[in-house]
Amino acid sequence: MNIHFIAIGGSAMHNLAIALHQKGYTISGSDDTIHDPSKSRLKKYNLLPTEFGWFPEKITNAIDVVILGMHAKKDNIELLKAQELGVKIVSYPEFLYEQSKDKTRVVIGGSHGKTTITSMILHILNYHDKEVDYMVGAQLDGFETMVHLTEENDFIVLEGDEYLSSPTDLRPKFHLYKPNIALISGIAWDHINVFPTFENYKEQFKIFTDSMINGGSMVYNSEDRNVAEIVESSENHIKKYPYETPNHFIDNGITYLETEEGDLPLEIFGKHNLQNLAGAKWICQHMGIDEDDFYEAIASFSGASKRLEKISENSETVILKDFAHSPSKVSATTKAVSEQYKNRTLIACLELHTYSSLNAEFLSEYHGALDAADKAVVFYSPHAVEIKQLEQVSKAQIANAFQRDDLLIFTNPKEFHDFLFGQDLKSTALVLMSSGNYGGLDFEKLKSLI
């Protein structure tokens, strides 16, 4: 099969390209720019385009299917050529569904935690040598790619993103998967550029629940009232399995899970991660992993990439980075670090980087998100606001949104970096939360602070 990727450089797209290349398909692709790690990984498999840009001559009748990435625009010249020739065009999730129609589809959804839960499940299955197909949104230890597709595996585990499928298919990705087994971890308003109200956003999870296969199993976080309302009121003929935060305690900076077999030390921490663990346990049981085998394997799970990831640590200081950027994630991450390192000063730094977080109307959602920190810092780039074609937000608007009088706000990368490297980190927990890079922050240099 000949497959062409329009926007091959995306995190998910390049991993799918590699997975299909490994499956023996002939792969080509284009993009106007590709950054690492996508660039070096595509190069490793000889899939990196020889030059960047869009080239309609790449689209011929010899191509069986074009996979269209969200980064491309509706007027992309390669897309227009494919439409003109009548070449089959599909979105990323549409293609994944086509590849998994005959498998048991396990889909992990939710505004937060879906990458971590998917990663936990894959870690457990890998630990016990159980082969499954998968698609996950982060690089995992022990897994070469973020996408794996075979003919023979019975299960496929899919991270169910609620963002749109492609420029020509405006359905949320997770609406296309039609799961046999599903999970919803939580609902907190996000992606306001496509879901302008919370009710509109919440409706997408109702549609997801209703899209499940008749007789399927829904695992859900019963402590999230929006999730519970949607699942428990669903008239779809599905089995419902609620979960909640398991019993645990923290001793000397280590979180212990209370089980019938004794107290189990974990490498992860935070109430949100313990909820994630409870959800992953239910899913694994549906996939044939019993409770004892789950506990044996979860003890060695250290977290998904960029999720409360330790950059550096010594006996009195820890530096962490986290992908948190939405209000609910920022709040959960800040509270988790505060509870885990109670006797240390907590410095919490947040970069406002996404479309939603830089939107003046959405900023109020961050009220109280950094309250658990001893020292709270926000960095944002006015240039990023300009690129996203949003109205500029002022420091006063940000201060008002967080409702914290001592909030430190930086808009200049050098000033923020100077502040950071000027801190005395003795007996401190420093957490850096962003989906960006703080204007080019040198994380390797940051390690030298302790």
What residue ranges belong to the model's regions?
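Fold-independent oxyanion-binding glycine-rich loops
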Residues: 8, 30-31, 69-71, 92-93, ...
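Short pre-catalytic strand/loop immediately N-terminal to key active-site residues, enriched for Gly-Thr
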Residues: 264-269, 317-321
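A conserved, hydrophobic alpha-helical segment in the catalytic core
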Residues: 20, 175-189, 228, 262, ...
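The start of beta-strands in P-loop NTPase/AAA+ ATPase cores
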Residues: 132, 154, 180-181, 216, ...
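Phosphate-binding loop of NTP-binding sites
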Residues: 19-23, 57-58, 70-220, 226-237, ...
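Short polybasic amphipathic segments
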Residues: 254-259
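Beta-strand->loop->alpha-helix junctions that form or flank phosphate-binding loops
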Residues: 51-54, 90-97, 135-138, 234-252, ...
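ATP-dependent carboxylate-amine ligase
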Residues: 1-37, 42-50, 62-66, 82-87, ...
